[in-house]
Each structure stands twice: as structure tokens, then as C-alpha cells.
Amino acid sequence: MAMKINTGEFHERVEKGIHNTFMRGAVAGAQERLRTRRLEAAQELGNWEEWRALGEEIRQHTLENLDYYLMQLSENVKKRGGHVFFAQTAEEANDYICRVVASKQAKKIVKSKSMVTEEIHMNAALEKLGCEVIETDLGEYILQVDDHDPPSHIVAPALHKNKEQIRDVFQQKLAYTKTEKPEELALHARAMLRQQYLTADVGITGCNFAVAESGSITLVTNEGNADLVTALPKTQITVMGMERIVPTFEEMEVLVSLLTRSAVGQKLTSYITVLTGPREEGEVDGPEEFHLVIVDNGRSDILGTEFQPVLQCIRCAACVNVCPVYRHIGGHSYGSIYSGPIGAVLSPLLGGYDDYKELPYASTLCAACTEACPVKIPLHELLLKHRQTIVEREGKAPISEKLAMKAFGLGAASSLLYKLGSKIAPTAVNPFTTNDRISKGPGPLKAWTDIREFPAPEKERFRDWLKQRGNE
């Protein structure tokens, strides 16, 4: 389990996000840039929808045969001299990782970006063991230095910070003395991290795709930090969600093309690294010992259900980058490691409805996420399924909602009441109307109009408009 992050009630987190004007501006700007780059990169292929269909087919086939490919992966990793551990829960994964680290008497660990290790709270488990865990992805490193600020985006974890804020963090925590120029900040971070690579006992990575036919893992990065994490420490541990697997390199090539274009609008990232087991005789770098931890943590419960398509996700965040709700509330409002539309679908499945039942309602159901997804996950439909499940689980709707729906039903079913309502509505709301917008709504409308305007009813009814123009 281990996923819970939420701090405060959902509506409190949302209100905080909405009133964070810098964050909203940063998110809006990033969404526009990433969306534009994604569309341009997709257009270069010329047949993007065919690529999406192929990506969907690959992911569906893999999930339908997941047990076979996981066994094939395990066998091939072991043939190459690696160790494989299947973890049913977050606790089992952390226990195994801690045992490996303790057996090496390791005290310093370098780590590349990994969502699944965030999901299982691996860093906290290792720190309890007395280890120092250093994030080497620049965004994650910034957040770690800033008192473990949680990530706000799947691909760009420090999206909610600007260069001045990062400069201040570095000045306070890393004795930084230069300006807020990104180049200078990056150089300082690189200098701080370089020594950590050289003195680390263990390297830990995530996994973009594991290749079943060879027992390889693939890491897709732009910074090169993952290469150093895997090349220098004597022991490497890779942690992957059980669904992050492809049958062969042929499928991997397709999904990497979709991933890089959808995530950051690039044909390819700067580094695409394929690692197969520990260092072999004659090789000059790489780990002496390799461990692959395959994490379930609720994923097997999703298989075979109507929510199975969510496991097709390749963690590109294209859905996040087009979501209008994310644009206004930011990633921290979700209170989960996984934000945006994919987080709203995945979090209740992995962490339970008790902690994440509000997230499926953090959506306009505009389907922009579904349209952007490179593997065609029907995200807006899955959000609706969540809502249905929540209503059935709760057993009843709030009394206020029941009364409102009943009143609307009575009015809509009666032509007399409907005519009367449409006639008096403009007059009834007139005291609350300014420039054809209700800015201070009465009763249940107040919660809406406190943060956004509500369109006022038209003064002229459609029936009257049509009657006047019927003879034209």
C-alpha cells in the first residue's frame, strides 16, 4: 500500500492550489509548451493514430499474457546472473531492498527517478535503516534538498518551482553563491552529485520497460544520471511495477518512440540505456551484483477488471499536460504520488477509495486526456466508472444532491413547471447578476461562485425567440 501522501482535506488542497498564482502560471506555461512540442513531434511521424493503435495493441497483448512474460523476464535475468524478487506488497518490496542493502553494509545510495519507489516509500524505509539516499534526477534532487517537497508532476517533478525559488533553496541548503541562471544551478547540482556517484555503495533505478526476451531493463532519460547510477556502484537494484514490461525489443522500440514524443516532444531522449544483468568478465563498468524487484502492490487486483486499461500507462504524462483541472489546481492538490487524470484513475485503485475517492470527480470529463494518451487508455470513461463505483459503495447520494435532482426531475417532466421556471429564473437571479454572470450565488451556488462565475439564465426564452422569428 504505502501510497498515502494527502495533507489535509481535498477541498483545502484544491483551494490552496487555486490561490497559488505562481504555480498556476507555471503549470499553464508548461502545459502549452509540452502540448505544442508533443503535437509537432507526433506530426513528424505522419501517421500518429496508427502508432497509437499499435501502442495500445502491444500493451493490451502484454497485459493479457502478463504472467508468461514476467516468468520469461525472471528466467532470463537469472540466466544472466541477476536476482529476481516478486513483491506482493510495498512492505515486501522494501523489506527485500533493505535486506540487500544491509547485506552490503551500505550507507550511501544513489537513485535515479522512479515513480514506483515513491509509491512504496522506499526512501523512508532505507533512511530508517540508517542509509543516506541521494536523488540524482535534477528535479527530484531539488525537491529532496527542499525538505523532501513532494513531486507535482510525473515527468517534471519540480514543475511548481521557479528558478528564483530553486536558487534560494540551493543558497540555504547547498552553500550556493551564484545567480538564478538555470545553467549555473545545473552545474552546481552536477558538482554536488558527482562525488556522490563515486562514493555510493548501491545504485537504485526504476524501469521504463523491461524486455522479457533478454532479461534487460530500459532507462529513458535526458540527464544521464541513470547511467552513472548503474555504472559506478558495485550493487544495482532495479524496482519496477509488474506491468512495465514488453515481450521483445521490437515492441520496446515502438513504446519508446511514443513515450519520448508524448512526454517531452522529442524524437528520442538524450539517453536510452539498456542494461542486462551484472557486469560480465572483460567489462569495465556496471554492477557486480544486480537485483530486480518486481512490484505488484495492488496491480494484480486490477487485472481482469474494467479498470485493466489503466495498466497500459507508460508514464508519459501527456494526459496531465492537457488536463484543464490540473492546470488550475496543480499536482499537490491530488494528494497522491500520481497526479492528473492518470492519478485520478490509478490512485483509488492502488491506495483505496477511503483516501482518494474525491479524485475521480476532479475532472470535467472533456476527454482531452483520452485523446492525448499515446496508448489510448479511455481515461474519462474510467473516471466515470470510478464515480459509479463510489456511488454504489457509499450506498446513497447526499441529501442535498437528492433534493436537487428530484426538484429538477419534477420541473423537467412538467411542461407547465418548465415554462414557469424558465420565465421567472432571470428575475429570481437578477440581484446576484453582473454583466450576465452570477458572481455571488445564493445557497448551494455559493461554493461555485466563490471561485468562478456562473452564467446567468438568458432573459429571452428560446420558445419566445423562435416564435418571434418563426415567420422570417
From Swiss-Prot:
TM segment ranges: none
Pfam families xref list: Fer4_8 (PF13183), LUD_dom (PF02589), LutB_C (PF11870)
InterPro entries from the UniProt entry: 4Fe4S_Fe-S-bd, 4Fe4S_Fe_S_CS, FTHF_cligase-like_sf, Helical_ferredxn, LUD_dom, LutB, LutB/LldF, LutB_C
Limits of the 4Fe-4S ferredoxin-type domain: 304-334, 353-382
GO BP annotation list: lactate metabolic process
PROSITE patterns: 4FE4S_FER_1 (PS00198), 4FE4S_FER_2 (PS51379)
Keyword Repeat annotated: yes
Binding of [4Fe-4S] cluster 1, residues: 313, 316, 319, 373
Keyword field: 4Fe-4S, Electron transport, Iron, Iron-sulfur, Metal-binding, Repeat, Transport
Binding residue positions for [4Fe-4S] cluster 2: 323, 366, 369
Gene Ontology MF, one: 4 iron, 4 sulfur cluster binding
Role according to the record: Is involved in L-lactate degradation and allows cells to grow with lactate as the sole carbon source. Has probably a role as an electron transporter during oxidation of L-lactate.
NCBIfam families: LutB/LldF family L-lactate oxidation iron-sulfur protein
Assigned protein family: Belongs to the LutB/YkgF family.
Protein name: Lactate utilization protein B
Organism whose genome encodes this protein: Anoxybacillus flavithermus (strain DSM 21510 / WK1)
